[in-house]
């Protein structure tokens, strides 16, 4: 089955709203083995939407739309789809009552504009919306399937998960299961080179690498006539990949790197404090996202100036004068200083040149040092990155977390 995603809304074209719906739907369709061939964004215009539907159905069996189901006059998706399938719009009494009930929860009464949201093509399957006033629907005709969903993600995603996926799984006549491996420390091209034999010989399961900032994910997808069989096909491929990539794999599924690190700290009861310069608190922020981290995370200090490094972390003035703030020597003294002042097992530090200014020939923009102190032992890592200030700061945090993980495992 081939699919296209049409996201409707002039606000998307103007850049007022980020289109996360296409990403979410594409990912979910890939999980059940449906190929997405095209994404389109269309303004609130009936003629353009009709043309897009005609173009999409020339090569796709399935078109999924999001947006344009609201109560205003420029919400035209439903009308356009009904016209394309040559269906009349009729009032659906059950939906009308549900919309009225939802409005009453907010002390609002039914208006003619809201009443419009209860009209649907005569021959369609209506998808209830417990999170809003815009139900979706599925319409099938002449081997064409259109699935029409609301635009707000908090309405669309539950509808897609609870209604659309079960509907589509019945059409595929097979079970598709996926497992995601999360990798950091090596880039997508290095991962692809290391597992090239697997990528070149893949059939079922398939293995697909995806690059993200600071990490790579590998999605292993298997198709079979049962869930048990599909999962069993994944096992030997996953084992082979783990043997090749080793500790570059930090987790699987939706696991985050900071979650892995925090779990290690909590399970081993290792207390930690952070001393940050170029990352300005981002590292501490990542760690404290994890529930339960308060039992081991004692302190986070942002020591941006040389004076604060000296006064707060006991970094030696002589070290700063001899090596400058951006140096492995200072990174190590920062890590040890925060650990000793906070009384923790671990101290971790970041210092570097994030840009856009401040770089020199000897200390260019993107030069970063991560210092680590663990129960009397010290470690340091030097990094060199190119990119804008935010990228360099974010990648430094990822590398710091991974540096800590590898030295704890």
Curated annotation (Swiss-Prot):
Xref: SUPFAM superfamilies: CinA-like, Molybdenum cofactor biosynthesis proteins
S-S bonds = none
In terms of Pfam families, this protein maps to:
CinA, CinA_KH, MoCF_biosynth
Family according to the record: Belongs to the CinA family.
Q: What is this protein called?
A: Putative competence-damage inducible protein
Provide the organism lineage as a comma list.
Bacteria, Bacillati, Bacillota, Clostridia, Eubacteriales
> What gene name does this entry carry?
cinA
